[in-house]
Amino acid sequence: MALTSTQKDFVIYDEEFNSALYERLQVNIDVWNAATYGALVITTDAMKGHFSKVSMYKALASDVVKEYNPENVTTTAFDTFESFEQVKVKVWRDSNIQKTVDAFKVLLLNPDATFSQLVGGLTADLITKDAIETLLSSILGAIENDTSHVLGDGTKFPTFKDINKAQFVYGDQFSNVACILTHSNTAQGIVDLNIDEKLDTVAGFTISTGKWHTLNIPMIIADLDALKDGANYKMAFLTAGAGVCVNSETVSAYTDIDLDSRPAMMRFKREWAYNIGVKGYSYDTTKGNYPTKAVLANKTSWKKVVSDDKELPCVVFKAKAV
């Protein structure tokens, strides 16, 4: 069906759309960033091109402090100070919706202003959910390159010992685990499995307070597709700054009215883009400029650029389904 109208036939009010979009988007971002304790960061910035690159210095592999005797003249050995380049990749998104003009008129609502505000808020929710899914898919895909950070085989739920082991994959940096992100199915399994465990007893009474079933690590329950592993699920122990999603372009909104339809249909198209970065990994630019979520979830799309595994974004435990 051809569209015969033009932009001027239906007006999107910038004030209503943008106020609803950015107010809701800011609320979503603030809540999510706080809830993950800085593990998954969503932010905004303007970035040109397909890739965002940054250079960082690697931690020295050997000691830089050496003892010496000032009375002996010896040859000095210099340690190599190396840097690495991390690449964030830009992904593009769009969304298209339509609604009859009469649907608003019958409620005595202004279709222009009401639709602008409604779609602005819905767009913010859509951007946030897609950003979280894409970012988490990228992190979980990248970490598959390092088997030491992948625990479990999908045959059981994580016990206290498994949760403790996941933390101490980071050795003396175990406190870097900021939160656990898990599917509700896995969360139910953890509680079912550990509900009879006693962390402390006082006069015969069991004391279990706070986040006892995850050893006091904050747990976020989110039924995200990225946490599904076939018929089973993944449980992500995320460190601070595990991933960053930068909303790197202004959200564009385009409108039109389909006059070939009876009744007339309001059509609305939204386009946006953001850059995805994973801690300790660099996107392989040979995989292309327009990666899909499936490409980002593939471990071959990411190259480890840090030499210390304690700088990797997460530990994953593969759990069975309830």
What role is predicted for each listed range?
Residues 65-66, 189-192, 230, 277:
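Short helix/loop capping segments that flank catalytic or ligand/cofactor-binding pockets
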Residues 82-147, 180, 257-280:
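Long, contiguous amphipathic alpha-helices that act as assembly "spine/axial" helices in icosahedral shell
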Residues 184-187, 204-267:
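Extended serine/threonine-enriched, polar tracts that run as long, contiguous segments within proteins
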